[in-house]
Amino acid sequence: MASGREEFVYMAKLAEQAERYEEMVEFMEKVSAAVDGDELTVEERNLLSVAYKNVIGARRASWRIISSIEQKEESRGNDDHVTAIREYRSKIETELSGICDGILKLLDSRLIPAAASGDSKVFYLKMKGDYHRYLAEFKTGQERKDAAEHTLAAYKSAQDIANAELAPTHPIRLGLALNFSVFYYEILNSPDRACNLAKQAFDEAIAELDTLGEESYKDSTLIMQLLRDNLTLWTSDMQDDAADEIKEAAAPKPTEEQQ
């Protein structure tokens, strides 16, 4: 008979196959409760990440669509529609806050304290940065400022460990650089810092590409491609700032991040 932990992992995989990600989150939260201070396995932490990424990803996509419609209706002067849209957007934001709060509590109370290896510490600190960044995407005023500060602190802690303990080609280190650079570009409006960080990570990985093991080659090269795509997009934006600001206001271009 499988242990409770193994049973929950199996059920999480089943929920993933069925694309029932809210239930996948519930099963993986049960797994993290069952480990009793131990570290999650690589498979378990990846399942947890996939579960939360899908649950939050659906709401982030909804929020972007609704915000875009809100801008259009505002420009047309449809005040009644704008009021209804804002109420609906607020509902989505409540869901986003709840999801982020859930994983951030789990990270702070269990996952980060139990992390022993360098790659797991970076993995969870990056995750902490990611979910504070998702809060910063829609929060305003002091709440946005706080979320941005928490994001920066988590990413910097992860970066310190990654630079000391992980190879430049390690997919977790590359994924951190990708998402950290997106944070600089989208949340802090610092395209220079974003480009510098992404370029440095890409160049350092290219220099050691021949050391890449077969198992992580695909993951690492995929993230390197995303870094390069963002650099291309951002540098073209910076070269034509005035025109691009108009384009972005009408139809924001998605910046790629690690899924």
From Swiss-Prot:
Subcellular location(s) per record: Nucleus; Cytoplasm
An annotated GO cellular component: plant-type vacuole
Keyword Nuclease: no
Swiss-Prot/TrEMBL GO biological process terms: brassinosteroid mediated signaling pathway
Modified residues (Phosphoserine): S67, S109, S190
Pfam families xref list: 14-3-3
Cross-referenced InterPro entries: 14-3-3 (IPR000308), 14-3-3_CS (IPR023409), 14-3-3_dom_sf (IPR036815), 14-3-3_domain (IPR023410)
Keyword Transport: no
Keywords associated with the record: Cytoplasm, Nucleus, Phosphoprotein
Residue list for modification Phosphothreonine: T211
Signal peptide: none
Stated role: Is associated with a DNA binding complex that binds to the G box, a well-characterized cis-acting DNA regulatory element found in plant genes.
Family: Belongs to the 14-3-3 family.
Quaternary context: Interacts with CINV1.
Protein name: 14-3-3-like protein GF14 omega
Organism: Arabidopsis thaliana
